[in-house]
Amino acid sequence: MRIKFLVVLAVICLLAHYASASGMGGDKKPKDAPKPKDAPKPKEVKPVKADSSEYEIEVIKHQKEKTEKKEKEKKAHVEIKKKIKNKEKKFVPCSEILKDEKLECEKNATPGYKALFEFKESESFCEWECDYEAIPGAKKDEKKEKKVVKVIKPPKEKPPKKPRKECSGEKVIKFQNCLVKIRGLIAFGDKTKNFDKKFAKLVQGKQKKGAKKAKGGKKAEPKPGPKPAPKPGPKPAPKPVPKPADKPKDAKK
């Protein structure tokens, strides 16, 4: 019996020792294998600069050409704008407009007469007159011509009108229709609908009487129910009842 007990005890001890050894060894991580040393990186070979600086000169020239081109484009753009503005602002005088009329007047002059061409200039039209004056010592024929030419200038374009904000803010006083609208709203007790705070304040300040009426609104109809008792006070004196007149005795007979 003793031998059996000792054998069993020895087996148990061996198993326990093996289990503890395997558990402790499992927690430990295997050591990484030694890494080989990194190979040296190849050195970057920088491009060797040429002895002459031709490349740099070419780049600079190219940049200069670009900037000059841009400046030319800008100048041309500005010049075009100036030309357009000058065309818009240019005012053609009547002396240029009536060149053909003056030549025609001079052509039609008969021998012994001198052409007199006069014109008046205004903002909207040019008025001109062609007359002929006899040269002293020459035969005079009656010849006179008068013409009026009106050059109508196109009317200037008016800028579009800004849309008017009806009944808004401080502009209320300026428009009569807004004032009418205010009075109507106050009369029906609707003084703040569709209006901002400034407008409501303006309404209260300018239309105090209307605002007071608006607070009450429409008078409510009396509800059906018992009438209130009359207030105590001095009773009126009873009216005298008229007595019936005595009938005459002869009437019975």
From Swiss-Prot:
Q: Where is this region: 3 X 6 AA approximate tandem repeats of K-P-K-D-A-P?
A: 29-47
The protein's name = Salivary gland SP38-40.B protein
Tell me the first and last residues of the signal peptide: 1-21
- Which residue ranges have biased composition labelled Basic residues? 206-217
Its main subcellular localisation, reduced to a broad class, is: secreted
Origin: domain of life: Eukaryota
Q: Give start and end residues of every sequence repeat.
A: 29-34, 35-40, 41-47, 153-156, 158-161, 162-166, 222-225, 226-229, 230-233, 234-237, 238-241, 242-245, 246-249
Q: Where is this region: 7 X 4 AA approximate tandem repeats of P-K-P-[GAV]?
A: 222-249
Provide ranges: composition bias, Basic and acidic residues. Answer: 26-51, 154-168, 244-253
Keywords of this entry: Repeat, Secreted, Signal
Q: Where in the cell is it found?
A: Secreted
Please spell out the taxonomic lineage of the organism that makes this protein: Eukaryota, Metazoa, Ecdysozoa, Arthropoda, Hexapoda
Q: Does the keyword Phosphoprotein apply?
A: no
**Comp. bias (Pro residues):** 225-243
Q: Which organism is it from?
A: Chironomus tentans (Midge)
What does the protein in this record do?
A: Used by the larvae to construct a supramolecular structure, the larval tube.
List the gene name: SP38-40.B
Which residues lie within the region annotated 3 X 4 AA approximate tandem repeats of K-P-P-K? Answer: 153-166
Single GO cellular component term: extracellular region
User: Does the record bear Secreted in its keywords?
Assistant: yes
As annotated in Swiss-Prot or TrEMBL, what is the tissue specificity of this protein?
Answer: Salivary gland.
Where do the TM regions start and end?
A: none
Q: Report residue spans for region: Disordered.
A: 23-51, 140-168, 203-253
